Curated annotation (Swiss-Prot):
It comes from Mus musculus. This is Exportin-7. Highly expressed in testis and spleen, moderate in kidney and liver and low in heart, brain, lung and skeletal muscle. Belongs to the exportin family. The modification Phosphoserine is found at residue 570. The lineage of its organism: Eukaryota, Metazoa, Chordata, Craniata, Vertebrata. Its main location: cytoplasm. It comes from the Eukaryota.
Length: 1087
């Protein structure tokens, strides 16, 4: 007993040190000791002691969090009886101690929610013992307000817990629990919550009473959690708020057909303090987003009418909207009016004319206060964008009145942005133009809004542009002009150029007229005239933001008016010809290229302008007709003949910039490569002339490497710039003739330099990443460009170089030792990922016969594959799925290996095979469909190989199985659980999940079943028996039909038959289970 007291005192002291000390060392020591305590065998009993006798809130918190970890662990889980005891203990503890610290209560409720979720399918005497949440909290709800708050918080936390997937348990298990909870309990909890809210609002809550305050807050959180539930398992991305539909089950219809539910929340909004209103509005946002199919047309019209009435009432009494959170949620609510309902439905609402006027006034006022809640404005612009986009399609006879109000919104946006410039400069405020992502998002929305009543938009833009341009010109000519006045006009012109680009980009071919194209011409002329003015001043001064706006304008103009699809008779070109003498597309392209060269000349040290300029050049080089017109321009010929740092400063080796700043060089050379290819043909002299600067760079690096002491920084910069240039050229050369010129130029002369760079600087990803990416591009058989003559050994020689680079990099990168977690991707995994991509490209390129390597004793293939295994084993499983690029490169490589090199896989050590199979097993449930599909393909190849080897081993043959196949069979027979687990996982996904790649899932399933017939039979019986008695026969029949006509082989005809059967099986199972709230009580199915 004394020991218990002593250890209790020690634990309490450690808790105090963990949560209260300011000394980092003491805290870390306490944390380490408490981690050991959590993992100790007597943790459970000590936690109970802490809760019973602990004198501090921190020790109670420790006990609750430790117990939560204990009940959550997947290996060695607690017995059912023990978990039931903990659940009951927690409920009693909460019921007898209402004055606990808030964070302790929260931690205990979290413990209750976790036990309930993970035990959802646990039975005791045919009773689901963890499904009595409402009964569990009834005693709390019938007591004082303090207890009522605890009861409501329990339900709220439980709903939230069940809605959230966690990484330690399979997604299939999570969805099964969530679906069962949705069908059996969620509506009852929602109804209870609404009833309690009605009671609370009917009692004239005394909001000065803090406990009643807390109760209302918890009730609103509970209601919001119910409405925010992921009803059908599709809300994987919580960051997106667009087009969000709440998939309310049909069984909830009654609650939404009853107008009092909607009215309750609007009444609450007006009767409670503004600090509570955001949650009320969040609930209304979800209610407004219920799926359309929940109602018939008449019901939807009635529901929408109530919703619009409620919105109108808020707009008529806008006092609470001065609170930023209220304002934000209300903007979201307005956006849902159009994302979920059609304009034709809105105009039929009785109060539509008043409401659209109020919404327009509210929007105009919001836009005029540009400094207030810019993130909320997104939702208002989203509403008007969708309204404007619907105008051509609306068939209702009632007037939509958008021709009156949309121009007001457009004008408010444009004028408010211009008026903001002076205030921002005067007061030194943050400039919205710095946030290019937000500006671009708003401009995309304005592009649609501004095209509605386009004549008014253009007239406004022309008027404002002419005013600002004239003032700007006068200021530039004045000797006494202040820099502030010039900056204001440049800021206003920056906004106008962005907006002009946006409205031109909003042109829709089927809805635009000659008059509108002529208006576009007016706007384009003005921007090009402004460009001539600003370009003429670049030697003295330039404005970065205005230049970025110009590039945005050019990009929009290119998309709409340049290219193969554009009608050359467009009125826009007529206007350009009249004003600027630009008679056709070729002359306009000349202006584009002139701007590109000017920017690269004057802004070569400004990365944002350089990269956007080069992106524009790259986009121009893609079009079939435009690239041919470009090549004829003297400016383009100048670029092809003078791509050196003397003419383009960004190609220089600037010691001040980072190596990563050279990325834009790849874009530049991709464009140049495309332009060169137009007329290159087989002209090797022209090619060599073009490559002279790169040849000189390679020779310079070779010269440096040949000496014992050289300037490492200069060598790195020269090499990194060079390989980035080459990667651009290699990417552009997608025809056999041109690519062979590049290959013969780089191999064998310069390949040793790349290998030497990897050898020297393997630890520096700024050097290795570009080199590895170049090699990965060179071995990529894009557009069948790597086709060597039958007498050429080049395919094998290229693979030898690939193997050499992978082996050299792989062996050296593994010597790095322990890498900090936050740097592991940059320093190690990124390079490994590129190596995997490189090896995959080489193995699947169809230009090497890999059988000859072993035949002639060449170890290139073996070295590359063994290095792959060494690199793979250095990566924890979790990292394979945590880093998307690594996932995709690994699983696509594994797919090629299992398809074409199964003998190699079969020859691996047992622990390596198990590692690979585990990675496939985990990848089957990945959220990335590409990864999941790749895993299915890998598994199919492995299972097919196994089945064939097994079939051969049972037949009497003169040639015995080779050693690898024999060992592989033996390993699989020794460890059947892994393959069985994957059978269970695949079947689980097909039955219980929204399976997006059903065909891919079906391919390995037949092999898995044939290899594990007894296990499949047990699994099937388990699923059938878990159904309600009246559904068991139907489920049994589903499984019978699945195997109907299926033979014991994996021939294509048999596989196709199985895939067809599986589609029917999935449909029948889903129909059978629709009304069932029962689940599969099978550990195999759930694990």
């Amino acid at each position: 007993m004394a020991d218990h007291v002593q250890s209790l005192a020690q634990l309490e002291n450690l808790c105090k040190q963990l949560y209260e000390t300011t000394d980092t060392t003491t805290r870390l020591q306490a944390e380490k000791a408490l981690v050991e305590f959590t993992n100790s065998p007597d943790c459970l009993s000590k936690c109970q002691l802490l809760l019973e006798r602990g004198s501090s809130s921190y020790s109670q918190l420790l006990a609750a969090t430790c117990l939560t970890k204990l009940v959550s662990r997947t290996n060695n889980p607690l017995p059912l009886e023990q978990r039931i005891d903990i659940r009951n203990y927690v409920l009693n503890y909460l019921a007898t101690r209402p004055k606990l610290a808030t964070f302790v209560t929260q931690a205990l409720i979290q413990l209750y929610a976790r036990i309930t979720k993970l035990g959802w399918f646990d039975c005791q005497k045919d009773d689901y013992v963890f499904r009595n949440a409402i009964t569990d909290v009834t005693r709390f709800l019938q007591d004082s307000v303090e207890y009522c708050i605890i009861g409501v918080t329990i339900l709220s936390q439980l709903t939230n817990e069940i809605n959230q997937a966690d990484t330690t348990h399979p997604l299939t298990k999570h969805r099964k629990i969530a679906s069962s909870f949705r069908d059996s309990s969620l509506f009852d909890i929602f109804t209870l919550s609404c009833n309690l809210l009605k009671q609370a609002s009917g009692k004239n809550l005394n909001l000065n009473d803090e406990s009643q305050h807390g109760l209302l807050m918890q009730l609103l959180k509970l209601t919001h959690n119910c409405l925010n539930f992921d009803f059908i398992g599709t809300s994987t991305d919580e960051s997106s708020d667009d087009l969000c539909t709440v998939q309310i089950p049909t069984s909830w219809r009654s609650a939404f057909l009853d107008s009092s539910t909607l009215q309750l929340f609007f009444d609450l909004y007006h009767s409670i303090p503004p600090s509570f209103s955001p949650l009320v509005l969040s609930c209304l946002v979800q209610i407004a987003s219920v799926r359309r199919s929940l109602f018939n047309n008449a019901e939807r019209a009635k529901f929408l009418s109530h919703l619009v009435d409620g919105v109108k009432r808020i707009l008529e009494n806008p006092q609470s909207l001065s609170d930023p959170n209220n304002y934000h949620e209300f903007c979201r609510l307005l956006a849902r009016l159009k994302s979920n309902y059609q304009l034709g439905e809105l105009v039929k609402v009785e109060n539509y004319p008043d409401v659209i006027r109020l919404i327009a006034n509210f929007t105009v006022t919001s836009l005029q206060h540009w400094e207030f809640a810019p993130n909320s404005v997104h939702y208002l612009l989203s509403l008007w964008q969708r309204l404007a986009a619907s105008v051509p399609y609306v068939k209702a006879t009632e007037p939509h009145m958008l021709e009156t109000y949309t121009p007001e919104v457009t004008k408010a946006y444009i004028t408010s942005r211009l008026e903001s410039v002076h205030i921002i400069l005067r007061d030194g405020l943050e400039d919205p133009l710095e946030d290019t992502g937000l500006v671009q998002q708003q401009l995309d929305q304005l592009s649609t809004i501004g095209r509605c009543e386009y004549e008014k938009t253009c007239a406004l833009l022309v008027q404002l542009f002419d005013q600002s341009a004239q003032s700007y010109q006068e200021l530039l000519q004045s000797a006494s002009a202040s820099p502030m006045d010039i900056a204001v006009q440049e800021g206003r012109l920056t906004w106008l150029v962005y907006i002009i680009g946006a409205v031109i980009g909003g042109r829709v071919s089927f809805a635009s007229t000659d008059e509108q194209d002529a208006m576009d011409g007016e706007l384009v002329c003005r921007v090009l005239q402004l460009m001539n003015l600003t370009d003429s001043r670049l030697a003295q001064a330039g404005n970065e933001k205005l230049e970025l706006a110009m590039l945005s304008f050019f990009e929009q103009f290119r998309k709409i008016y340049i290219g193969d699809q554009v009608q050359k008779s467009s009125k826009l070109y007529r206007r350009l010809s009249e004003v600027l003498g630009l008679n056709d597309e070729t002359m306009v392209l000349s202006v584009f290229i002139g701007k590109v060269i000017t920017n690269l000349k004057y802004w070569g040290r400004c990365e944002p302008i350089t990269s956007k300029t080069l992106q524009l050049l790259n986009d121009l080089s893609i079009g079939y007709s435009s690239v041919r017109k470009l090549v004829k321009l003297s400016a383009v010929q100048f670029m092809l003949n003078n791509h050196t740092s003397e003419h383009f400063s960004f190609l220089g080796i600037n010691n001040q910039s980072n190596l990563t700043d050279m990325r834009c060089r790849t874009t530049f050379y991709t464009a140049l490569g495309r332009l060169l290819m137009v007329d290159l043909g087989e002209d090797e002299d022209q090619y060599e002339q073009f490559m002279l600067p790169l040849t000189a760079a390679f020779e310079a690096v070779a010269q440096m490497f040949s000496t014992n002491s050289f300037n490492e920084q200069e060598a790195k910069r020269t090499l990194v710039g060079l390989v980035r240039d080459l990667r651009g050229i290699a990417f552009a050369f997608n025809a056999k003739t041109s690519f062979m010129m590049l290959f013969e130029w780089i191999y064998p002369s310069y390949m040793p330099i790349l290998q030497r760079a990897i050898e020297l600087w393997y630890h520096d990803p700024a050097c290795t990443t570009p080199v590895l990416k170049l090699m990965a591009e060179l071995v990529h058989n894009r557009s069948q460009r790597l086709q060597f003559d039958v007498s050429s050994p080049n395919g094998i020689l290229l693979f030898r170089e690939t193997s050499k680079m992978i082996t050299m990099y792989g062996n050296r990168i593994l010597t790095l030792g322990e890498v900090p977690k936050d740097q592991v991707y940059a320093l190690k995994l990124k390079g490994i990922s590129i190596c995997f991509s490189m090896l995959k490209a080489a193995l699947s390129g169809s230009y090497v016969n890999f059988g000859v390597f072993r035949l002639y004793g060449d170890d290139a293939l073996e070295n590359a594959l063994q290095t792959f295994i060494k690199l793979l084993l250095s990566i924890p499983h979790s990292d394979l799925l945590d880093y998307p690029k690594l996932s995709q490169s690994y699983y696509s490589l594994l797919e090629v290996l299992t398809q074409d090199h199964m003998n190699f896989i079969a020859s691996l050590e047992p622990h390596v095979i198990m590692y690979i199979l585990s990675s496939i097993s985990e990848g089957l449930t990945a959220l990335d469909t590409m990864v999941c599909t790749g895993c299915c393909s890998c598994l199919d190849h492995i299972v097919t190989y196994l089945f064939k080897q097994l079939s051969r081993s049972t037949k009497k043959r003169t040639t015995p199985l080779n050693r690898e196949s024999d060992c592989f069979l033996h390993i699989m027979q020794q460890h059947p659980a892994m393959i069985q687990q994957m059978l269970s996982t695949v079947l689980n996904i097909i039955i219980f999940e929204d399976c997006r790649n059903q065909w891919s899932m079906s391919r390995p399933l037949l092999g898995l079943i044939l290899l594990n017939e007894k296990y499949f039979s047990d699994l099937r019986n388990s699923i059938v028996n878990s159904q309600p008695p009246e559904k068991q026969q139907a489920m049994h029949l589903c499984f019978e039909n699945l195997m109907e006509g299926i033979e014991r082989n994996l021939l294509t005809k048999n596989r196709d038959r199985f895939t067809q059967n599986l589609s029917a099986f999935r449909r029948e199972v889903n129909d059978s289970m629709k009304n069932s709230t029962y689940g599969v009580n099978s550990n195999d199915m759930m694990s």
